[in-house]
UniProtKB/Swiss-Prot annotation:
Cytochrome P450 monooxygenase that is able to use 7-ethoxycoumarin, anthracene, phenanthrene and trans-stilbene as substrates for oxidation. The chain crosses the membrane at residues 9-31. It is found in: Membrane. Heme binds at residue 483. It comes from Postia placenta (strain ATCC 44394 / Madison 698-R). It is a single-pass membrane protein. This is Cytochrome P450 monooxygenase 215.
Length: 547
């Protein structure tokens, strides 16, 4: 009797699961014919199974996206698996609507789940009220006054990298081929360690071995890279039950998180104790710990402020989640952007020369934040780099309800009707094409794909409508979820470019057509003929001598 009951229960559960799966399959198969996006203009699907996916994978550097946008207009669709329509728009009003209503357009659940496993529920991943609380408490740590205090760290680490490269140039007789990506990645790791939580990774120390926390974060970066290319991890993120199957990914991630938690909690405890002691002894006698510049100390100090109600404070776990968040958000993004900046300068000797002349007009090797920000051509070079080579090419939001998204530019649907809005069904993905907006000819003019810092003297009126938090660019996005650390990244990058371009002349070490990129979490450079070596940017470097 009991056996029969168990059998009936199992049969009922199996039937329910089968029915649920069948419903989802049927819904997916019908979506091309029921989706609110079905009448948007766009290219025909190459096949029922793949849609336009094979064409997209064959194209490089979003070339096909740009071709489609020029052909079909700023708001269109293309087809992914099973001919499912995917929205693509660079309409500034539409994107501003989505970014300014972030509560209705969170990150996709599968993306959040994958990132939480690696990073914890920090500012980049958190949604809703938790994100608002984290942001409110963290905002003061990223203000101009705080970034000013961190500039010395950026300059010191940039000079350390300069000296390492200078020694290599001298050893090799005046010129040397260097993978600048590697050195810049080590520099930004050291900088975010000190500026983020006063921890020295010693990544630039050529004789030192990676310390325990360094190794743990290297494992996290590797696992994040795996997310970009592993079909198993993609499927695992989409099917919740598969996440409970132990594998090498989960074991490595758990081991790295264990180290991060142990050392992170130790850092938090030490900083909380220092803040308490400083508060007891008074502001004037606070000592070096209270005046510490690192972001984690500032976050803990703000979180312990009597002005913050107890129920609005972050838990130690919430604070801990910011440690890997600081590292990921402030490490590879800046190093990759600076790598592409040096690449662009290697292709534009006149721009490189003009920039170097401006930099040599500063009478010090160790500029302040104000001195860096007072250099107009350096600022234009950084803006143009961030426009043409945004570290993150795009992001995605998911509609949590049916919505009507307004458009600045109306579109004509497949039936010849004009629309000044897009109707979005609940669950529809809304991509934010950062690189698409930054390189759009409709927004930036016919030379939008060219590196031309002079454009920043007067940008087109259309580009002025882009709803970015900085410089009419989508690089740091906009709205309530705009990148909180954009000032941090920009000053660090300026310190690097200032120090390195003053000291060296840069040429590309391989033919320009040999340089390509892979689009993942960040846009990493590769050499086509040396793909087995992984990400790299080989430049010929020689010391610059003032005449």
């Amino acid at each position: 009797m009991l056996t029969l009951a168990v059998h009936d229960i199992l049969w009922a559960v199996g039937a329910a699961l089968l029915a649920c799966a069948a419903f989802k399959i049927i819904r997916v198969l019908l979506l091309p014919y029921t989706s609110s996006l079905r009448d948007l203009p766009g290219p025909p699907a190459s096949s029922w199974l793949l849609g336009n996916v094979s064409e997209l994978m064959a194209a490089e550097d979003f070339a096909l996206h740009f071709e489609w946008l020029e052909k079909y207009g700023p708001t269109m669709k293309y087809n992914v698996w099973f001919k499912l329509p995917e929205l693509l728009t660079i309409d500034a009003r539409a994107i501003n609507h989505v970014l300014s209503h972030s509560q209705d357009y969170p990150k996709p659940e599968e993306t959040r789940v994958s990132l939480v496993e690696i990073l914890g529920n920090g500012l980049v991943v958190a949604e809703g009220e938790l994100h608002r609380r984290q942001r409110r408490i963290m905002n003061p740590a990223f203000g101009p006054a705080q970034i000013r205090e961190l500039t010395e760290i950026f300059v010191d680490k940039a000079q350390q990298l300069r000296d390492i490269w200078r020694n290599e140039v001298t050893t090799c007789g005046g010129t040397v081929r260097i993978d600048v990506q590697s050195g810049l990645t080590k520099m930004t790791l050291d900088a975010i360690g000190l500026a983020g939580f006063n921890y020295n990774f010693n990544a630039l120390n050529p004789d030192g071995k990676a310390n325990e926390l360094n190794r743990a974060f290297e494992m996290m970066f590797q696992r994040m890279a795996d997310l970009e290319r592993s079909y198993w991890l993609i499927i695992r993120s989409l099917i919740p039950i598969l996440r409970y199957i132990p594998d090498g990914y989960t074991r490595d991630t758990a081991a790295a998180q264990k180290v991060t938690r142990r050392i992170g909690m130790q850092l938090i405890a030490e900083k909380k104790a220092a803040v308490r002691q400083a508060a007891q002894s008074g502001e004037k006698n606070a000592g070096s710990e209270l005046r510490s510049r690192d972001l984690l100390t500032l976050l803990i100090k703000a979180n312990m402020s009597p002005d913050i109600p107890e129920d609005q404070r972050l838990s130690d776990d919430d604070v801990l989640a910011q440690v890997p968040t600081f590292l990921v958000a402030g490490h590879e993004t800046t190093s990759n952007a600076t790598t592409w900046c040096l690449y662009a300068l290697s292709q534009q000797p006149n721009v490189q020369h003009k920039l170097r002349e401006e930099l040599w007009g500063v009478p010090t090797d160790s500029p302040s934040m104000e001195e860096l920000n007072a250099l107009p051509y350096l600022d234009a070079v950084i803006r143009e780099t961030m426009r043409l080579f945004p570290p993150i090419a795009g992001t995605v939001r998911i509609a949590t309800k049916d919505d009507e998204i307004p458009l600045a530019t109306p579109y004509m649907d497949a039936k010849g009707r004009m629309h000044d809005s897009i109707r979005i069904d609940k669950g529809t993905a809304f991509p934010i094409p950062i690189i698409g907006m930054n390189r759009s000819k409709a927004l930036w003019g016919e030379d939008a794909r060219e590196f031309r810092p002079e454009r920043w003297g007067s940008i087109p009126e259309a580009a002025q409508q882009i709803p970015g938090v900085w410089s009419n660019l989508m690089t740091f996005i906009g709205g309530p979820r705009a990148c909180i650390g954009y000032r941090f990244s920009l000053i660090e990058m300026k310190a690097l470019v200032f120090t390195l371009v003053r000291a060296f002349e840069f040429e590309l070490a391989v033919p320009v057509e040999d340089i390509t990129k892979k689009i993942g979490l960040v846009q990493r450079p590769f050499v086509r003929s040396e793909m087995e070596k992984g990400t790299q940017m080989p430049l010929i470097i020689k010391s610059h001598t003032r005449e």
